[in-house]
Design a protein with these regions (language model features):
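Extracellular "spike/adhesin" assembly and maturation modules
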Residues: 1-123
Length: 123
């Protein structure tokens, strides 16, 4: 029986992992980091995930967090005992913080670039 805090392939759906990878890929792309993380990669069974894949994800989250100045404690995967909710939460929190920072900066850049006061084009 699985420990309570471990995620089985039934609990972590394809949509969950794809959403995480999709956000990560897009945020990396937005800051100019070309990553081999493929959007739409499907992990049907976590018994088949390679530890190297998990380490790639960790490394790219570290790069993203470093860019935005967000603290992220990298985990080194050397065996595949299971992915815990804590691991998924670490990824999601870090990616969401970077996404919020990116959105806020994007809005500020947009406003400062296009906010022409007096010509009827105000944001």
């Amino acid at each position: 029986m699985l420990k309570e805090n471990w995620i089985s392939s039934d609990l972590l759906t394809v949509n969950n992992i794809n959403e995480i990878l999709d956000k990560l890929y897009n945020l990396l792309y937005n800051i100019g980091i070309d990553s081999p993380i493929m959007v739409g990669v499907y992990f049907y069974d976590f018994k088949w995930i390679y530890t190297s894949d998990l380490n790639y994800i960790e490394n790219y989250i570290v790069q993203l967090c470093n860019y935005y100045g967000i603290k992220f404690e990298k985990k080194y995967w050397d065996n595949m005992d299971g992915i815990s909710y804590k691991d998924i939460n670490r990824w999601c929190i870090a990616i969401n913080l970077c996404e919020m920072d990116y959105s806020e900066n994007k809005k500020e850049r947009y406003v400062s670039e296009y906010n022409y006061i007096g010509d009827g084009f105000n944001i």
